[in-house]
Amino acid sequence: MKYTGSIFKRSRRLGFSLLENNKEFSKGKKRKSIPGQHGNRFRSSTLSGYAQQLQEKQRMQYMYGITDKQFRRLFRFVLKQKGNLTVNLFRVLESRLDNIVYRMGFAPTRKSARQMVNHGHVILNDQTVDTPSIIINPGDKVRLKARITKSPLVKNFIENSVISSFVETNKKAFEGTYIRFPERSELPAGINESYVVEWYKRLVK
């Protein structure tokens, strides 16, 4: 089931910035305990191995905005690839089209990037696409359709957006290129992907 509540509340519960900018913990939003009646008790307790795996799985799942069913399907795909499993997991997640649209600075969140793709505002290699979960490759080109670039809100955001180092973006042309797979050091440090791998290795055959 996909989580539809407040991303700020979810981030505080997980103790991790799902927006990757710590806005959820900025002054006026941070609280002394995680949401819920027993927040302090759960925060102070030592997590079991199972609970640690669950927490890391949830952090990764909610950050990339995918359901558990989608994650299992993606994990099966990653299991078939050669190389380091944890590295490949992050590479595949980062290579989703909605994530690349976000990394190129075309959308403030992955959720809004998914909406852009769903509504047909994104062109991949000269083809209009509407599937956010498409896995793209280094060298692929992404462009926004003209109708959405006319929005003052979109234009203003893109002009001031931060672009990830593993993509190139031409803000004036509203287009970009996925240059290379990201290094682990360029990705969120607050997730222990080894726990995520252990979680899904039990469930996915």
From Swiss-Prot:
Concerning Pfam families, the annotation shows: Ribosomal_S4, S4
Q: Which SUPFAM superfamilies match?
A: Alpha-L RNA-binding motif
Name the InterPro entries on file: Ribosomal_uS4, Ribosomal_uS4_bac-type, Ribosomal_uS4_CS, Ribosomal_uS4_N, S4_RNA-bd, S4_RNA-bd_sf
S4 RNA-binding domain: residues covered:
95-158
Q: Which SMART domains match?
A: Ribosomal_S4 (SM01390), S4 (SM00363)
Q: Which controlled-vocabulary keywords does the entry list?
A: Ribonucleoprotein, Ribosomal protein, RNA-binding, rRNA-binding
One term of GO molecular function = rRNA binding
* Matches recorded under Gene3D superfamilies: Ribosomal Protein S4 Delta 41, Chain A, domain 1, RNA-binding S4 domain
Task: Output the Gene Ontology cellular-component terms.
Answer: small ribosomal subunit
A GO BP term here is:
translation
Keyword Ribosomal protein included in the entry's annotation: yes
The free-text function statement in the UniProt record for this protein reads: One of the primary rRNA binding proteins, it binds directly to 16S rRNA where it nucleates assembly of the body of the 30S subunit. With S5 and S12 plays an important role in translational accuracy.
What family name appears in the similarity comment?
A: Belongs to the universal ribosomal protein uS4 family.
NCBIfam families from the UniProt entry = PRK05327.1, rpsD_bact
Q: How does it assemble?
A: Part of the 30S ribosomal subunit. Contacts protein S5. The interaction surface between S4 and S5 is involved in control of translational fidelity.
Q: What is this protein called?
A: Small ribosomal subunit protein uS4
Which organism was this protein described from?
Answer: Mycoplasma genitalium (strain ATCC 33530 / DSM 19775 / NCTC 10195 / G37) (Mycoplasmoides genitalium)
